[in-house]
Design a protein with these regions (language model features):
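Generic detector of well-ordered alpha-helical segments enriched in charged/polar residues
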Residues: 4-15, 65, 69, 94, ...
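Structural alpha-beta junctions
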Residues: 12-21, 70-75, 98-102
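Compositionally biased amphipathic helical and low-complexity segments enriched in hydrophobic
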Residues: 41-42, 79-81, 105, 135
Length: 142
């Protein structure tokens, strides 16, 4: 399934990619992730979700987060448009879950994430995301 247009615009703007067909990890990647919202960014797995609701909310699979917890680090990016949203590192995600701010819905195995989310994790442009979370420096206004 192709990525949502806004998700695609965001990942292109920040330089996230999927493994190329024929690469050693491509087949494993496609088996694990049926939707096109899983990427690589600066050597880290990155999950990008978008909410289309007036009051934004997202669902993120416990199974996927458990899988990613075996990695050194990863990003979870929650978008409200192609330009703005919130980003969370592995430790940020763990804090949100352990504090019960993100609650697991047992019926479907998804963490339910509702706004408001921490201002410290917010970004208002792909350039600001890159500067804030990747340490990249851009000339563009943020």
């Amino acid at each position: 399934m192709p990525a949502d247009t806004d998700v695609q615009e965001f990942v292109e703007a920040v330089g996230a990619t999927e493994p190329a067909p024929g690469s050693p990890n491509y087949e494993k990647w496609k088996l694990l992730f049926r939707r096109s919202n899983y990427f690589l960014l600066s050597g880290k797995f990155t999950v990008v979700k978008i909410s289309r609701s007036k009051k934004p909310f997202w669902g993120v699979s416990k199974e996927i987060l458990d899988l990613f917890d075996n990695l050194d680090d990863y990003f979870l990016v929650l978008l409200v448009s192609s330009r703005e949203g919130w980003a969370f590192s592995k430790s940020d995600v763990r804090k949100q879950i352990s504090s019960q701010r993100w609650k697991l819905r047992e019926a479907d195995g998804n963490y339910k994430i509702n706004s408001p989310l921490p201002d410290a994790n917010a970004f208002y442009s792909p350039e600001r995301f890159s500067t804030k979370f990747l340490g990249a420096h851009h000339d563009a206004a943020t």
